[in-house]
Amino acid sequence: KLTEFKDDYLRLTNHWSFNDYIGFEVGLVSHQRKAVVESFYKLFNYPSKYVSVAPAVALELLPWGKKGSIFKIDYEKGWKNLLGSNIDYERVEADAQTIFQASRRQSYSIRLGAGFYTRKGDHWDFVDYTNFHDDNIPGGWNDSWSGEFELLPSQWYNASDYYIRGNFTYEAPMIATAWLPLIGKYIEAERLYVSSLVVNHLHPYTEWGYGVTTRAITLGIFAAFKNTKFNGIGCRFGFELFRDW
């Protein structure tokens, strides 16, 4: 626990939709990270609290309206000494998300994005990238795991001065498990997940996953690879009982 921090996150945003095709955001983003064991940092004359306060603007483009793809560009600039901030930085991120319906029950979910710092002051690695918090797709993804990295700790990308990402999900009523006797009749949808990320020290990080949805639950299993080497496996679980409420 010596190197752990408690993170208080605040984001205030005002969003304008000029029409169905263009949106604009202005807001303020703040992180306050406080060391769990403050005495450890004071012993070495390091700050035990890191605060960032950044005005942020974003432009959204929806070329085919609110039921289609969305492209978003985010810009943040953190000012040192603004409302107690001790971190200054400047960052740009771009994100594109879409769901392509091949048929009524078959779809492809795609997310592509990149981000980088144009200015890095002291302690800049105590700031989070925006597009690993937000999902911009109108109406949301078809499930909780599309467009995300399930097994990767956030410090890998937040401590990098750049990232390039891609997330892909294929959904269909019958891929593998639905063909099996006895249990196949309970499967409503199956999904294949492929995600990739390039950051400092990971060239690349990839996740491969498979998920099934029944009327009651959703189950997923994911395998992670760091620089092409197997890094672990994990499972995810979700309830579907109240999906249609």
Label each region the model flagged.
Residues 1, 64-177:
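C-terminal outer-membrane beta-barrel translocator/porin domains of Gram-negative envelope proteins
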Residues 1-104, 191-193:
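Transmembrane beta-strand segments of outer-membrane beta-barrel domains in Gram-negative
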Residues 1-17, 31-46, 110-153, 221-245:
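Outer-membrane beta-barrel translocator/channel fold
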Residues 4-10, 47-55, 86-92, 106, ...:
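Residues that define the transmembrane beta-barrel architecture of outer-membrane proteins
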Residues 12-16, 28, 57-61, 94-98, ...:
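Residues on the lipid-exposed face of transmembrane beta-strands in outer-membrane beta-barrel proteins
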Residues 18-24, 66-71, 90, 104-110, ...:
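Outer-envelope beta-barrel architecture signal
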Residues 20-26, 34, 62-69, 102-108, ...:
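Repeated loop/turn-to-beta-strand initiation elements of outer-membrane beta-barrel proteins
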Residues 178-187:
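Short helix/loop segment immediately N-terminal to the Walker
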